[in-house]
Structure formats: C-alpha cells, structure tokens
Amino acid sequence: MMARKSAPPSKAGAFGEDSDHMSRDDAAEGFGQFERFLQEWSRRDFLKRAGGAAAYLAFMAGGAELLAAACGPSTAPTSLTPVKGGKLIEGMISDIANFAVLNAGDTSSQQVITLTFDGLLGIAANGDNIPLLASALPTVSSDSLTFTFKLRPNLKFSDGHALTAEDVVFTYGLMFLPETSDFVSRYRSDLEGYIQSVTAPDPQTVVFKFSKVQASFLDSHCRRGILPKHILGNVTPKALNTHDFWSNPTVVNGVFKFVKWDKGQQVVFARNDNYWAGPSNLDQYIYKVVTDAVVLAQQLKTGEIDVGQPDASQFDNLKTVTTIDALTFARPSFVYYLYNLDKARTSSYAMFSDKNVRKALHMALDRPTMAKAVYFAYATPADSVQVPMDWAYNPNVSPKYKYDKAGAQKLLDDAGWAKGADGIRVKNGQRFSFEINTNSGNKVRENLIQVMQQQWKEIGVEAQPRPIAFQTLVTQLRTTHTFQVILLGISSGDTDPDQTSLWTTKGIGAGGLNGMQYVNPEVDRLMAEALTTTDRAKRKPLYFKIQDILADELPGPILFYPSYLWGINKRVKNFNVGPYNEYQGRAWMKDVFVTDGK
C-alpha cells in the first residue's frame, strides 16, 4: 500500500485568501459556522480542551465543511464532443520524489508514474482490473501457479521503439531475480520466493510461473509500469538505483511524455503520440506544487489550477462557486500515527516498547471529537488496519478503544511512568517527551498533531509537533528511521488486502514501508499464510486475526478513515477520478478534455 497521502495517503499525502489572510466577510461567515458547530457537538467540551481562540483557529484551518453534502465519485457524464488541445493544471500540496517506477512509496510520485508508465493491467474507479498493455485479463492455470498474458499488437514506447514481452520480462526480473537483488524495489518482498520465472515465448506473450501461490499478484502486482529494456537493460542493478532516468524519464509508454521537472514548482508533461490507445485530448498536463491546501483552494476559485484536493476548511465554500464541481467520496485510505520501535533508538524504544503505554496514548485521544473538529464529518474514527470498503475488513475487530482519560492515566501509572513536578511523566530519569512529525502544508494533519499534543499533555505526556516537508518525512520513514512518532496517511490503489510491506519484517528492509521496525512473528506467519490461497473464504479469517493482533499491539494506531475531497473546474470534462484510480490508475486521463481547448 501506499505509505497516505493521506494519506493520501498515503497512503499516505499542497493562494491569497487563506486562514491567515482572509477577508472580513469570510471571517464573519467562518465564525458564524463555527458558532453553529459548537452548538452541534458541545461548546463546553471543545472549549475545555482547546480554549476559545485556539478552537476558532482550529476550526478555520481544519474543517468548515460540516454541512457539505456527499457527491458521487466523478464528474457528471458528458455528451459533449471532446475538444482537442489545451492543458490541464492539477494542484498538489507536495512535490514528487522521483519517477522510480518500482520503488516509489509516496502518492505524489505514484500519480505521475501512472501518467507515464502503463502496466499490463490498470484499475477502474471501482477497483476492477482492466487491460492496458495486455489485450485481456490473463489466463490463469487451475492451480493459480501460471499466469499467461497476451500483449496488444503494435505497442510502442514514446520514442517509437517497439514494446514487447521482453520489456515485461526485464521489468519483473528487477523485482524478484537473485541476480538483481542489488536493485532496490519495494515490491521485492512481495514477489521474491514466489515467482519462479517470467518468460517471453514470443514478442506478444508473457508467462509468469510461481513456485507457490501468491494470492495478491493479480490485484496488486500486474499494474507495475513497464520499463524500456533498450534504455535500461545494460545498466547494472546497483547502478540503476541512482540512474538519472528516475528524475528524467526520457522514454515512457503512458498517456503523457515527460517534459521537465522544476523541483518544488511543477512537473510538465506533453501528449504521447505513440500511446497505445491513441493520443490524449490534452496537449499538456501540469502537476503544480501548491504547498498549502488552503492556498490550493483559492487557486481553484481563481482558475490558476483546474483540479485539486482542497483543505477541508475550504470545501463548503467551494461548493458555492459556480465554476467548480466539489466532489467527495469514500477512499481506501486511513490516517495513522506510528512509533519508532527500533531497539537501537533507545530513547524512543524506552517510551514506546510497552504496548500498554501505546494503548494509554491511544485511549487519551478523543477521536470522535477530533473527527468533527478537524474533518467535520468527512472522516470517521477507525479501529482496523483494513478499510471498510475492503472485503477483508473486520467490523468486530477487538479490542476497540474509546476515549478514556482516567484509564489512560492508570495504564501509565502501572507502567511506572510517574508525573514529575512539571506534570510530565518520568521513568528511570527519562521524561516522557517526544517529537511528532507530519507533512507541512496539510492543514488537517497539522491541526491533528496540535490536538494530539493537547490531549496527551492532559495525561502527563509531552508531544512536540513538528511539520516537515513531505519528501523528508518519507525519507525518515523508509530510509533513515530518525523519527520518534510520525502521523501520515496510507492510500491504496489495490483491492487485495495484503499488507506485508507495512506490518511484517519483510517490510523493514530497503524499500519497505515498515519504517516503525515492528516485529511480530505471528503477524509474519498469518500474512504469509493468507497469500497461499486465492479462496477469500479461507483468507478472510486470517486477515481478521491480523486485524485483532494489530489492534491489540498498536504499533501504528489507526485514527480515521478520511473521505476524498476534490475541486474540479467545470471546463474540465471526463475527469473520472474515483476511490481506486486516483494514484495508481491514471490511464483515464487520455479522455480528459477542456471545453475551451486552452
């Protein structure tokens, strides 16, 4: 999955008139909404926790969208004849990290990768597999150990070079072959030990043979972008890790070609005339970096950008703008915070290694109140690592945690963390004090860690909020492991519930997403066993057990299931984004057009 953006997600994974520079009319309207908000869910409770001024600031920065109604997952179908030409500008609150097709772990990078590199299959808005480079879904043997794909005829890369089965063999070889182990791929832990061979009997046929069943292969791993062997085939696996292709992909096969990347500002793409499905309607697509989601909403209003995901505090207002479609829908995503459980990080390990301490911290968070104060009904408190739209979701996961300040304090007392003279708990001479990071520019998450700081302080725990650049956050999680606590989101473009890279020891190594260094042999065993069959009736109980274990252990407590919020200029048509195809399935961008052709 993809550590989201939130989180996006994520996962995980940003203006004139923002929360710091608003007009008097906007401020008055916001305060009126805030007053109604207080009346709705307990003025006394919120003021007690945050104080009047802080409550108002949190409201303005975090969610004036309480009264907004839910909409469908895409723009209304249009009978207009597509207009050729023009450009579309999409605003995003963080820059991309790279075009590392087989290793990108952030949603920003995944989004541009799927614009430039198609896989054998794609994913529809509802999660269904759809053929892209493959002419149809694969033929699968009765024992689920052999997958045979037929490629579409006359496939080409953007430079006109033929795309054949050999390119598929080359790409997948980087993810499982022993001789390519020096190449870092986040998917190696999912495929190594399962794939026996990938062969090309002829230029149009690819055969995957497995030594044992890998149940998530079809729904999770057939969408990997296919790389050009004629460009990268002579590069050693180790050298490939730092090859400039990942920042300057000169040859692609997706709907758009890469033009340039102005870091911190924009990524520019042009129509790929050699695209297998025909050239896109748009001449140009621009990924614009707008590092503040409030500013992003303002740029939607002014037309500086055409589409984007606005800050929650601006969403209700966007619904009143006649030039914008404001859309919201459920997403396969959760927002969570995770601890650094690496024993080598002695300070963090001393605080967080005891699961009862982790339980205490989670019980101290008033999540229903937080959901209303920050998300305003566009998120629901979460209890499971699986999302409700997943077939493996356990609605009766156990244990579940209610807000219990007294219970949290007792757990900390029992664990030997006693309050010091300044009210902060101490054990063996160490103060219970740590830094919590999230991605800067995401106002909802910045507000969340502020509220978490306040509520943890009430039980004698000192948290120091520190928002940092998203790509720095990703580096801390996946590479340096220098964090103490991180809050972020996980967004998945996959419909398979496998989370091996997130919670098992396989995900601790290079390229994995288990940056918390969580180790539980039973989770490892159950996750592996769940991949040994494609029978959902057999897999489901195993995932239920995993959810119970992670709910009890809380290495990365799940806070919320957020909704997608989108603003789309009405000049944009066929922008058919949905729950599953936002980051990992952008082939539909071929049919997007702008009515003025500009």
Model regions: which residues?
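N-terminal lobe/hinge region of extracytoplasmic solute-binding protein
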Residues: 91-142, 173, 251-253
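Detector for C-terminal structural segments
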Residues: 14-16, 27, 51-52, 57-66, ...
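N-terminal secretory signal peptides
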Residues: 1-45, 60, 65-69
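Ligand-site clamp/hinge motif
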Residues: 244-247, 272-318, 332, 450-453, ...
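Alpha-helical secondary-structure segments
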Residues: 89, 164-171, 203-209, 254-255, ...
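Aromatic- and charge-enriched surface segment that lines or borders ligand/interaction sites
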Residues: 136-182, 207, 296-299, 351-353
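Surface-exposed binding/hinge segments that line
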Residues: 150, 186-235
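Gly/Pro-rich hinge or "lid" segments in bacterial periplasmic/extracellular proteins
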Residues: 125-128, 222-280, 284, 294, ...
